[in-house]
Regions:
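Activation loop
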Residues: 40-43, 87, 207-210, 214, ...
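Residue-level signal for the nucleotide or nucleotide-sugar donor/cofactor binding architecture
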Residues: 64, 93, 101-104, 158, ...
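Residue-level recognition of oxygen-bearing side chains
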Residues: 68, 78, 97, 104, ...
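A conserved pocket-lining segment of Rossmann-fold NAD(P)-dependent short-chain dehydrogenase/reductase
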Residues: 91, 150-165, 189-203, 213-237, ...
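Non-catalytic, surface-exposed connector residues within folded enzymatic/regulatory domains
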Residues: 92, 124-125, 191, 204-208, ...
Length: 341
């Protein structure tokens, strides 16, 4: 029998890609989204074009509305909670809205799951920002990047949480509540502390989704500003690999419930945000890219890459799409869909 999925933020980048995958399988899907992001209507159009307007249930609503999310969750077998405020910079300028969307919105969604009486699986998209600046970890500067001096495989889940920036705090609140609902209420919940996720259907902007944003800006001739020294290192993970991890956790929920997993490309898929990504982008574009420079932004880690060994051991998961292959796929999608931007 087909499972009933509730995807909050289902019209967003990760959400729409997962909805597409689920509809291909014949799942029953409810997309729950407030459509506040510019790309959301375009992602819905894509889903309707591929599967038909009646292929999924659409609820235009906000997770800050406890009554609406409780109603949406009543029959859900799986809840994938992706909705929220996603930019560190926005959290600094408007911390109240950030807290309401991420902390209260996640609490409302957890309560909806708990009170449904349906024992749903609950997947939560957390963030590596919960680790904060990792000031106790030594980093080393090379010609094109910063890197960890001692964490050869990257940051493990045992790294102390430090919650820098209002965004890190609000997502961290959700992170800890999701874990505790597994302990206290037996909710079958899983936390994924996600690194930089990228891929098609990502309408990146300067404040969030840097890899997609720079690709879109380069292809469409928009100005790119590099903040900090451009050597900040991130591990990048293609969205298809992330969705494989969601699938693995759902399939192995007896193992995964109550667990936290770092979810990123790991040490083999790291990239300096401009010192290394810039030349790759220029090669794909076939020309030099002029950029502006500005100072460091709040909460911007010099280094982050995840040790995903726990997910590999417990879920049998690891990334399949290499960095250069994935970036080339994203570049081609942007080139072929310039009218969307």
């Amino acid at each position: 029998m087909a499972l009933n999925y509730l995807i909050t933020g289902g019209a967003g980048f990760i959400g729409s890609n997962y909805v597409h995958r689920l509809l291909q399988r014949g799942a029953n899907v409810t997309v729950y989204d407030n459509l506040s992001r510019a790309g959301a209507p375009r992602n819905l159009d894509w889903l309707k074009k591929d599967f038909g307007a009646d292929s999924f249930n659409m609820q235009v609503a906000d997770v800050r509305d406890a009554a609406s999310i409780r109603e949406a969750a009543r029959q859900a077998d799986v809840i994938v909670h992706l909705a929220g405020q996603v930019a560190v910079t926005t959290s600094v300028t408007d911390p109240r809205s950030d807290f309401e969307a991420n902390a209260i919105g996640t609490f409302n969604t957890l309560e909806a799951a708990r009170l449904s009486g349906h024992d749903p699986i609950f997947i939560y998209a957390s963030t590596n920002k919960v680790y904060g600046g990792m000031d106790d970890v030594r980093v080393v500067e090379d010609a094109t990047r910063w890197h960890y001096a001692d964490l050869v495989n990257g940051c493990p889940e045992t790294q102390p949480l430090d919650f820098h920036s209002p965004y890190g705090c609000s997502k961290g609140t959700g992170d800890q509540y999701v874990r505790d609902y597994a302990r206290i209420y037996g909710l079958r919940s899983v936390v994924f502390r996600q690194s930089c996720i990228y891929g098609p259907r990502q309408f990146g902007i300067e404040d969030q989704g840097w890899l997609a944003w720079m690709t879109i800006a380069a292809v469409t001739g928009r100005r790119i500003t590099i903040y900090g020294d451009g050597k900040q290192v991130r591990d990048v993970l293609h969205v298809d690999d992330l969705l494989d991890a969601y699938d693995a956790a759902i399939e192995k929920i007896d193992v995964a419930k109550g667990r936290v997993y770092n979810m990123g490309g790991g040490a083999r898929n790291v990239l300096a945000v401009w010192a290394e990504f810039g030349p790759l982008l220029e090669k794909l574009l076939g020309r030099k890219i002029e950029v502006a420079r500005a100072g460091w932004r709040p909460g911007d880690q010099r280094v982050f890459y995840a040790d995903f060994g726990k997910a590999r051991k417990e879920l049998g998961w690891e990334p399949k799409i290499g960095l250069e292959d994935g970036i080339e796929r994203l570049f081609r999608w942007v080139q072929e869909n310039q009218a969307l931007f």
